[in-house]
Structures are given as C-alpha cells and as structure tokens.
Amino acid sequence: MKKNSLIVFFATILFSLVSNSIYSQDNLLYNMSHVPQINNTNPAKNPSCKAFVGFPALSSLYFDINNTGFVYKDIFKQMPTELDSFMIDLDKIENALESKNYLTFDYKYSLINFGFRIKQEWYFTFGISTNINEQFMFPRDYVSLRRGNYSETGIPLNLGIKENLSIYHEFAAGLSKKFYNGLTLGVKIKYLSGLANLQSNKLNLSWATSTADTAIYDWNFDTDFDIRSSVPVGWGFTRDSSNFIDGAEITEFDPDSSAQVEKFLNENRNSFLFTNNRGFGIDIGFDYKIDNQFSVSGSIIDLGFIKWKDNAKTLTQSGQFVVSGIDMAKYYGDYNSVVNAGTTTWA
C-alpha cells in the first residue's frame, strides 16, 4: 500500500509541474489501447495488438483545435423575437475572455509508422510524420473595440498579439518495457527537421485616444515588434523610396512562373525532407497498473528544440505615431468659400 501511495504522490507532483504549460492534449486517445496512436500520448502506453503498420494514405491523420477563451455556448444566443434563429452574443464572448487568450492548432500526418511487441515485456515503435503546431495569443480588447476606441479609464487598448507557428518533419523511435510489478516505462527519441517557422517574441500594439483640450481625440499608437522567421525558399524585404520596408518577395525564383516553380520543387525535393533546421525531442512516460480497475499514468511529450537556420530573418520595429485626423481643407479648398457657395439669401 505504501508503494502505491508513493507512486500516486509522484504522479501528482509530475502533473503539477507540467500542467501550466499544457494547452491541449489528446484526451480521447489516452486510454484507447486498441488504437496504435495511443503511443503518441504516452510512450509507456502501447496498443494491445502484437504489431501494426501504417503507410501513406493508409495511415493516421490527426488535427486538434483548442482555445482558452470561450466555448460554443458563449458564442450564440437565441433571437428574442424568432425562436428558430440565433445571433452572436458579443457581450457573453467578451465576459468569457481573459486579458490574454490562446488559440492552438495541431496537425499530424503520419507518412509511415509501425510497431511490434518483443517477447512480452518490450514494445518498439517507429514513425515518420509531418507536423504543424500553432499557438496564437489575442487580447480581450479586440472584442471591446466594438464599443469604440475611447476608454473612460484612460488605459490604452491592448491590441498586441503573439504568434508561434512551426512546420516540421519528425522521425521518432520509441521503446517501452513492462516490469513484473505492473509498472511500464517508455521513452521516445525524435529527430526533427524544420520546414518553416514564424515566431513573434514581441508584437505589442497599444491604442490610446487623447482627451486633452489641445489634442482632443488624437489617436496615439505605441508599437514594439520582434518577429523571426525561417522558410524553405530565399526571400527578402522590399523598400520604398524612403528606404522603409513596405513588403516582402521571393528572391530564389519567380512565383508567377509555373516553370520556375516546378524547376525549384524538382531540384529541392529532398531538401524539404532533410533541412538545415535540425533539432531533437524526447517523450517520456510511465504507466502503473494498481489492480484490474485502477491505474496511474503520466507523460511529458514533445520536449525538445529546433535550431532554425534556413533563410532565417528577424524584423524589429519600435516607435510611436499620432493620428490627428484629416485636414479636409487640403482636399476641398477653403472652408468658408465652400459654406458661402452653398448659402442662399432670402429677401
């Protein structure tokens, strides 16, 4: 009994340490032992079958969307005059949002994967997959903006966002061992080949509306950007006549020429699979069967890194600017002449 209590205690500590960094998890797969993909959630959990094989078009496709802000019931409300119609409830959405909200998207396509049991206690798995992971942060003030840009509290609107997008290939080999006392330990080692990345370390934007007598309703914007990217094609920034960046373009080939695009893809087909953006990852986990009805398990997955090198660029910007309105006299001439021209005198 002491041994069981000790395992439960350490499992609780493990979940406490990692819970703050978890935004989504394959909850539906976790205890589905008849599905080979159970190994993706915990390398110590293995399918009940002796062996499995997956090929392109016959393998698994997984995607997952989560958000920390609102749920479905917060989005719609029934129309008061029409019982069979619904409308978007912006007030309820705003109340459900936090100051910072996260939207995550995960996609995994298995190109090939297989696994087999060795004797009774060992299980080996191997897989190659393409992964897309995105995490987008947005503030509540984007919904609050529907009431206007003026703030009675004097606090500027926070319109800063955060984006982290990674596309990469994963080559993973896993091994687990079942011990005689009901404990199973597993580990999965991953080689990562990055394809593209977009990361905003800082993407801060605030909007304040002035109420001073000398600058009534002036719009004051503060910006602070730090954006980093890596893509599989050569590209660069374009600049205007004042040498300010006004856009970006592909420099390695002409994207409007189908012949050049096809030539580039044929010449670089292998480099898309094995890039210079190399990294490593690891999954570790345990599963302890207490009895026929209860078990305790835990895992840490996707712990690793990718060092981005291919066509890596950084864009930084920090500044302030003020919008004081539009001087209509520049477009319509003198205001008094316009008024006088439209005035009629009655005798």
Regions found by a protein language model. Name each.
Residues 22-136:
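N-terminal, post-signal peptide beta-strand-biased segments of exported outer-membrane/organellar beta-barrel
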Residues 3, 98-102, 159-163:
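Short coil/turn segments at secondary-structure boundaries
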Residues 17, 46, 59, 235-236, ...:
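A generic alpha-helix propensity feature with a strong bias for hydrophobic helices
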